[in-house]
């Protein structure tokens, strides 16, 4: 069986995955190194949004469901991309997929091996793009490449009525800020207590992270619930702890899945949103 070792640095993800999938179907074994340096063309905002949406995809009606799963690491993202180009639901595709291996960096056993490049898959001079390693860092993956450790960062968002919140969670000392204000000083008290609910449920987990939340629009309670959702979702993503997720759901499922309900405005011709003045013919 033929073996091909490819240096993924400077290759475009889709083009390289297309070539690799064809080689696998022909019965070859393929090893891809430097997976974190494979490029995705397009703007950073688009690329991050695309993969974040895949990771966040879940059943809204049943948040305790564990799938579908999508990888965060660059080597696993590449493998998943190749898998999508194979007839994976058939035995032929599954057997071919077993011949693919991808690595972050260059492992010691491949230091002295001859690596090839795929000219048709090289990036050339693209104007917009980012490496899989950058995507993985934004998605929260923690990788060690040589002596460099990619720091784990989690980005989350939440919404309640017209309030929209976005937050970032990274390693820290338990500092939580809402619109640059420490949560302990956030006013009014009703909103502060609402925001701190997931922090109290999470327990000691909060001592090892810093959380920054930016919330705009809506009213006091709407902003508080949007910020609460950002914190709860972020802690679940950070810990990957299904017990913590279950705890949030049991306490209040709207921490994770949102609440579309809102007060319907009053309209003319009646005492309320739906009530109408009744006309009597007697």
From Swiss-Prot:
GO terms for molecular function: RNA binding; structural constituent of ribosome. Residues 150-282 are annotated as: Small ribosomal subunit protein uS9. GO terms for cellular component: cytosolic small ribosomal subunit; large ribosomal subunit. Residues 259-282 are annotated as: Disordered. Gene3D superfamilies: 3.30.230.10, Ribosomal protein L13. It holds the Pfam family Ribosomal_L13. Residues 273-282 have a biased composition (Basic residues). Residues 1-141 are annotated as: Large ribosomal subunit protein uL13. Keywords: Ribonucleoprotein, Ribosomal protein. GO terms for biological process: maturation of SSU-rRNA from tricistronic rRNA transcript (SSU-rRNA, 5.8S rRNA, LSU-rRNA); translation. InterPro entries: Ribosomal_Su5_D2-typ_SF (IPR020568), Ribosomal_uL13 (IPR005822), Ribosomal_uL13_CS (IPR023563), Ribosomal_uL13_euk/arc (IPR005755), Ribosomal_uL13_sf (IPR036899), Ribosomal_uS9 (IPR000754), Ribosomal_uS9_archaeal (IPR019958), Ribsml_uS5_D2-typ_fold_subgr (IPR014721). L13 protein is one of the early assembly proteins of the 50S ribosomal subunit, although it is not seen to bind rRNA by itself. It is important during the early stages of 50S assembly. In the N-terminal section; belongs to the universal ribosomal protein uL13 family. L13 is part of the 50S ribosomal subunit. S9 is part of the 30S ribosomal subunit. This is Fused uL13/uS9 ribosomal subunit protein. It comes from Methanothermobacter thermautotrophicus (strain ATCC 29096 / DSM 1053 / JCM 10044 / NBRC 100330 / Delta H). The gene is rpl13/rps9.
């Amino acid at each position: 069986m033929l073996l091909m070792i490819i240096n993924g640095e400077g290759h475009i993800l889709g083009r390289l995955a297309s070539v690799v999938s064809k080689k696998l179907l022909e019965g070859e074994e393929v090893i891809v190194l430097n997976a974190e340096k494979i490029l995705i063309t397009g703007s950073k905002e688009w690329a991050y949004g695309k993969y974040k949406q895949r990771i966040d995809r879940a059943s809204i009606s049943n948040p305790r469901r564990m799938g579908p799963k999508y990888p965060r690491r660059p080597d696993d993202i590449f493998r998943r991309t190749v898998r999508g180009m194979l007839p994976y639901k058939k035995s032929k595709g599954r057997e071919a997929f077993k011949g693919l291996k991808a690595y972050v960096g260059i492992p010691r056993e491949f230091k002295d091996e001859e690596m090839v490049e795929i000219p048709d898959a090289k990036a050339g001079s693209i104007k917009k793009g980012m490496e899989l390693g950058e995507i993985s860092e934004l998605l929260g993956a923690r990788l060690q490449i040589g002596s460099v450790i990619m720091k784990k960062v989690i980005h989350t968002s939440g919404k309640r009525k017209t309030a929209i919140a976005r937050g970032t969670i990274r390693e820290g000392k338990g500092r939580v800020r809402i619109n640059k204000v420490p949560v302990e000083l956030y006013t009014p008290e009703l909103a502060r207590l609402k925001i701190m609910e997931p922090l109290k449920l999470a327990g000691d987990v909060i001592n090892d992270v810093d959380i920054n939340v930016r919330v705009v629009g809506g009213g006091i309670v709407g902003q508080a619930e949007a910020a609460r959702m950002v914190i709860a979702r972020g802690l679940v993503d950070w810990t990957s702890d299904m017990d913590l997720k279950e705890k949030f759901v049991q306490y209040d499922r709207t921490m994770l899945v949102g609440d579309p309900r809102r007060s319907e405005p009053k309209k003319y011709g009646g005492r309320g949103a739906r009530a109408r003045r009744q006309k009597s013919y007697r």
